[in-house]
C-alpha cells in the first residue's frame, strides 16, 4: 500500500472501510513534534466532511477507479437515470452520489461517473458550469438595476441562485455547479 505522502488532492482512498475523496492534504511539521499530514476528506457514501491527521509514514488504501461518460436522461424517484454514451446501457444513480450538483441536473447533460474497482458508483462529476433559465424572480425596478445588490431566483431545475438585480424571468444564466453561484448572463 502506498504512503500518505504519495497521495494527492482528488485521490480516492478507503478510510475506516468507506471510500473518501481527498479534498486537501497539507504536510505540517510543528516545533518539537513529528511531522504529519492534515487531510480534509469527503465520505463518498454519506457526503460528510472528515478531518484526520495521518503520520508521515502511515500507509493508505488507494482505490483504483474508472471514469466513464454518461448522459442524464430523467429522474426516477430519488434516483437519476443515466445512459452510457458508448454502450447505451442505463443505470440508476442515487442522489447522494451527486451531492449539491443534483440541483443543477438538466436533461441530456453529460457527466463523468467514477466507479470503484468493485463496480460501485463513488461520485458523479458534473460540468463546472451549466446554463439554466431563470423561471421565477422578483421584478426589478429602474432603481434596482443601478445598484449592485443580489436577489434570489429560481432556475429551471428548481435550484435557488442569488443573481444580480438586472436578471429577469426568462434570462439564461451560467452557474458554477460546485458552489451554486451565479457567474454571468448568457446572451443568446
Swiss-Prot record:
<dbReference type="GO" id="GO:0005737">
    <property type="term" value="C:cytoplasm"/>
</dbReference>
<keyword id="KW-0648">Protein biosynthesis</keyword>
<dbReference type="InterPro" id="IPR011768">
    <property type="entry name" value="Transl_elongation_fac_P"/>
</dbReference>
<comment type="similarity">
    <text>Belongs to the elongation factor P family.</text>
</comment>
<dbReference type="InterPro" id="IPR001059">
    <property type="entry name" value="Transl_elong_P/YeiP_cen"/>
</dbReference>
<dbReference type="Pfam" id="PF09285">
    <property type="entry name" value="Elong-fact-P_C"/>
</dbReference>
<dbReference type="InterPro" id="IPR012340">
    <property type="entry name" value="NA-bd_OB-fold"/>
</dbReference>
<dbReference type="InterPro" id="IPR008991">
    <property type="entry name" value="Translation_prot_SH3-like_sf"/>
</dbReference>
<dbReference type="Pfam" id="PF01132">
    <property type="entry name" value="EFP"/>
</dbReference>
<keyword id="KW-0963">Cytoplasm</keyword>
<dbReference type="InterPro" id="IPR014722">
    <property type="entry name" value="Rib_uL2_dom2"/>
</dbReference>
<comment type="function">
    <text>Involved in peptide bond synthesis. Stimulates efficient translation and peptide-bond synthesis on native or reconstituted 70S ribosomes in vitro. Probably functions indirectly by altering the affinity of the ribosome for aminoacyl-tRNA, thus increasing their reactivity as acceptors for peptidyl transferase.</text>
</comment>
<dbReference type="InterPro" id="IPR013852">
    <property type="entry name" value="Transl_elong_P/YeiP_CS"/>
</dbReference>
<dbReference type="InterPro" id="IPR015365">
    <property type="entry name" value="Elong-fact-P_C"/>
</dbReference>
<dbReference type="GO" id="GO:0043043">
    <property type="term" value="P:peptide biosynthetic process"/>
</dbReference>
<comment type="pathway">
    <text>Protein biosynthesis; polypeptide chain elongation.</text>
</comment>
<dbReference type="InterPro" id="IPR020599">
    <property type="entry name" value="Transl_elong_fac_P/YeiP"/>
</dbReference>
<keyword id="KW-0251">Elongation factor</keyword>
<dbReference type="InterPro" id="IPR013185">
    <property type="entry name" value="Transl_elong_KOW-like"/>
</dbReference>
<dbReference type="GO" id="GO:0003746">
    <property type="term" value="F:translation elongation factor activity"/>
</dbReference>
<protein>
    <recommendedName>
        <fullName>Elongation factor P</fullName>
    </recommendedName>
</protein>
<dbReference type="Pfam" id="PF08207">
    <property type="entry name" value="EFP_N"/>
</dbReference>
Amino acid at each position: 500500500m502506498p504512503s500518505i505522502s504519495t497521495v494527492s488532492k482528488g485521490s480516492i482512498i478507503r478510510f475506516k472501510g468507506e471510500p473518501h475523496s481527498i479534498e486537501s492534504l497539507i504536510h505540517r511539521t510543528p516545533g518539537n513534534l513529528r511531522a504529519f499530514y492534515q487531510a480534509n476528506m469527503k465520505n463518498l457514501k454519506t457526503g460528510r466532511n472528515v478531518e484526520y491527521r495521518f503520520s508521515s509514514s502511515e500507509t493508505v488504501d488507494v482505490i483504483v477507479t474508472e471514469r466513464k461518460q454518461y448522459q442524464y436522461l430523467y429522474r426516477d424517484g430519488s434516483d437519476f437515470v443515466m445512459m452510457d454514451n458508448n454502450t447505451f446501457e442505463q443505470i440508476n444513480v442515487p442522489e447522494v452520489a451527486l451531492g449539491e450538483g443534483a440541483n443543477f441536473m438538466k436533461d441530456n447533460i453529460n457527466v463523468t461517473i467514477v466507479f470503484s474497482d468493485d463496480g460501485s458508483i463513488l461520485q458523479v462529476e458534473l460540468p463546472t458550469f451549466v446554463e439554466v433559465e431563470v423561471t421565477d424572480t422578483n421584478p426589478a425596478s429602474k432603481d434596482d438595476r443601478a445598484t449592485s445588490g443580489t436577489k434570489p431566483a429560481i432556475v429551471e431545475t428548481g435550484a435557488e441562485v442569488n443573481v444580480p438585480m438586472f436578471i429577469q424571468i426568462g434570462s439564461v444564466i451560467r452557474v458554477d455547479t460546485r458552489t451554486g453561484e451565479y457567474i454571468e448572463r448568457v446572451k443568446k
